[in-house]
């Protein structure tokens, strides 16, 4: 069994991580650290776990008992945590924050998008789990970048559920504001653009266009729906060939019909659809922001790092209705 530790275990993504790991056939939670909830049952915080476990949160960090550590702290806090709490070299780390996603001297974290970095993840000691928007958008764009056919500016619109903002209450996550409402935020400046641009230029270094990304807050709890628009001279057949890279993928599927959120919510699945309209190309992609956009993808990365079946613990069914 893979012995697991979790830090920052009280958030939404951590709750999904716990849910997945409790049902994982080859992993066992050793500790789940949450200073503000030490001694409380998992189900006191993650109420959907009621009846599933009598495990309790702890304020301890017994690193010597684990094989892998999931860090589920807020952005900018992971690096500080690791400086103050050195983790033994033999313990693998999967970080949920953006602290290690951007390549830099001394940063040995592999970017954890399995569809493009599987072989590197398999050999990695440390993995930076991609952001939720970044995952959904890259799955729409990277097949074109890998084929070297992205040209000109790319317009991206993506709408996310309220869980993407985290568990701490904010004015823009309050039910009476969010319900029946939509809004934009961080227009053209969202932090996930850094990792998206990094990946595109990794596969297509000569791409010179802009990524014009407008994020939206949706009036639903979970999921991301992305549309990507660009001009192209490619035929539909050539476009389909680019996305054939997803053939055989355990979770990401290229489909020939329109897609919707309910097909992926509560799963680690990603769906991508690309359709040509004259000289215009529209690519749509959908994921669950808490699973393929966070906890599910983190477990997928763990599975790859330990050489077990990539879908272990992740055979989840969409709600559908």
List the model feature ranges, each with a label.
Residues 229-321:
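C-terminal active-site/capping subdomain that shapes the small-molecule cofactor and substrate pocket
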């Amino acid at each position: 069994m893979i012995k697991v530790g979790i830090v920052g275990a009280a958030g939404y993504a951590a709750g999904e991580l716990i849910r997945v790991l409790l049902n994982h056939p080859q992993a066992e939670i050793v500790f789940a650290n949450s200073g503000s909830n030490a001694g409380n049952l998992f189900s006191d915080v993650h109420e959907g776990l009621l009846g599933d476990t009598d495990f309790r949160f702890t304020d301890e960090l017994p690193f010597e008992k684990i094989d892998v550590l999931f860090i589920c702290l807020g952005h900018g806090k992971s690096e500080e945590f690791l400086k103050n709490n050195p983790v033994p070299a033999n313990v693998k780390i999967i970080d949920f924050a953006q602290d290690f996603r951007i390549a830099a001297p001394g940063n040995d974290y592999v970017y954890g998008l399995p569809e493009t970095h599987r072989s590197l993840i398999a050999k990695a000691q440390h993995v930076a789990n991609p952001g939720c928007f970044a995952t959904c958008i890259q799955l729409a764009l990277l097949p074109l970048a890998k084929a070297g056919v992205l040209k000109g500016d790319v317009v991206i619109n993506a709408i996310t559920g309220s869980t993407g903002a985290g568990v701490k209450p904010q004015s823009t996550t309050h039910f009476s504001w969010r319900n029946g409402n939509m809004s934009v935020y961080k227009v053209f400046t969202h932090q996930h653009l850094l990792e998206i641009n990094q990946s595109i230029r990794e596969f297509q270094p000569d791409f010179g266009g802009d990524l014009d990304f407008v994020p939206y807050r949706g009036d639903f709890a979970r999921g991301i729906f992305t549309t990507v628009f660009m001009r192209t001279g490619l035929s539909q057949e050539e476009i389909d060939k680019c996305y054939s890279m997803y053939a055989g993928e355990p979770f990401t599927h290229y489909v020939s019909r329109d897609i919707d959120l309910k097909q992926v919510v509560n799963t680690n699945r990603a769906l991508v659809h690309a359709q040509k309209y004259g000289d215009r190309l529209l690519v749509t992609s959908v994921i669950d922001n808490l699973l393929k956009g966070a906890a599910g993808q983190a477990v997928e990365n763990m599975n790859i790092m330990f050489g077990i079946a990539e879908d272990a613990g992740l055979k989840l069914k969409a709600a559908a209705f």
